[in-house]
Amino acid sequence: LASSAASDVYKRQAFTSLLINYDPRVVNYKTLTKRLQKLLKLDVNEEISTSRVFEIPVCYGGEYGPDIENIAKNAGLTEEEVIKIHSSKDYLIYMLGFLPGFSYLGGLDERIHTPRLANPRIRIPAGSVGIGGSQTGIYPLDSPGGWQLLGLTPVKTYDPERENPILFEAGDYIRFVPVSEEEYL
């Protein structure tokens, strides 16, 4: 899709769907459908686009991750084990939603799947890294939320002043890198 009239075709992927908006005065319908049919025939393991990997520093636990003790207890692990598991892999961004730039990350190790809070918080600070069920993610803005928080990143994942306000795209990867409080500050 990107190779022909990229600026005239808008696409947005989610978990099980793909939205494609286009201007039929600019992009021919038959050409577009032929291109889509070719894409549908690709091996799902074949790389279609170039993904980026973002290393995101996270200060885990303490005041930065107020729920890490509960996450560890729920999993039957120590806090250190939770941190090691959470930061040991690259997470695929399945989709963005809920808030501008909120990344729904897949591939969370089953050992640290954690239920959402029974009573969501009124305010979660921007940069909070949380777990909600089988997913992990980063809150891009101060907002209400029900995910359990295990850390905080100083990286601004959403900044309306940037040329591209949202740092990530669906299909990119995030790698969490533990940092000390001194490194965080």
Across the structure, where does each feature detected by a protein language model lie?
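Anionic-ligand-binding alpha/beta catalytic cores of soluble enzymes and soluble regulatory domains
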Residues: 58-113
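Short, basic/aromatic beta-hairpin or loop at an interaction surface
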Residues: 102-109, 140-156
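A generic structural motif
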Residues: 16-22
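Short, surface-exposed secondary-structure edge patches
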Residues: 95, 120-122, 163-167
